[in-house]
Amino acid sequence: YHGDRNGGLDSKEAFADFAEQCFDMGYKAFKIHGWHEGDAKEEAENVLHVAKKVGDKMTLMLDPACQLKTFADALYVGKACDEANFFWLEDPYRDSGVSAFSHKRLREMLKTPILQTEHIRGLETKCDFLLAGGTDFLRSDPEYDMGITGAIKISHLAESFGVDVEI
């Protein structure tokens, strides 16, 4: 899930090499799940390094999985995503993705779109988050969002606002 300090995805070079391997296997996009220490400087360096190696041939996304410690850390890493032309920044910091206000502020300060609502459950709360301006994309998970019926309703919600939903 995340980068692994015990080998595997243990460095920015390893992430970039893996992204290149994925491209060689035919993948057109690559989502980074960095390390779980929440080191903003290291995450930003990883973003820029991977983009330098494959950014001109793959769509890149970053999911820190709520591991960045502060809003400022999310802004710092988000600026790296801007520089590297990332497609989205997902669940960036440790509010667990539940503050529409703070994510609206982050959206206003970045050009990289924000993907939120993985940790927001149900149709109404996702609608509230979207209407408050806290996200550019919606996330739905049938396991947690009222089953297949709930996921379909969330998809219809997204469609009605012209927003994509990631399932």
Where are the language model's segments positioned?
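Active-site mouth loops of central-metabolism enzymes
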Residues: 1-16, 63-71, 115
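Generic intrinsically disordered, low-complexity segments enriched for polar/acidic and small residues
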Residues: 12, 24-27, 83, 158
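Structured alpha-helical segments in the cores of large, soluble enzyme domains
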Residues: 15-22, 46, 50
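Catalytic domains of carbohydrate-active enzymes, especially glycoside hydrolases
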Residues: 18-33
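Catalytic core of soluble alpha/beta enzymes
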Residues: 34-167
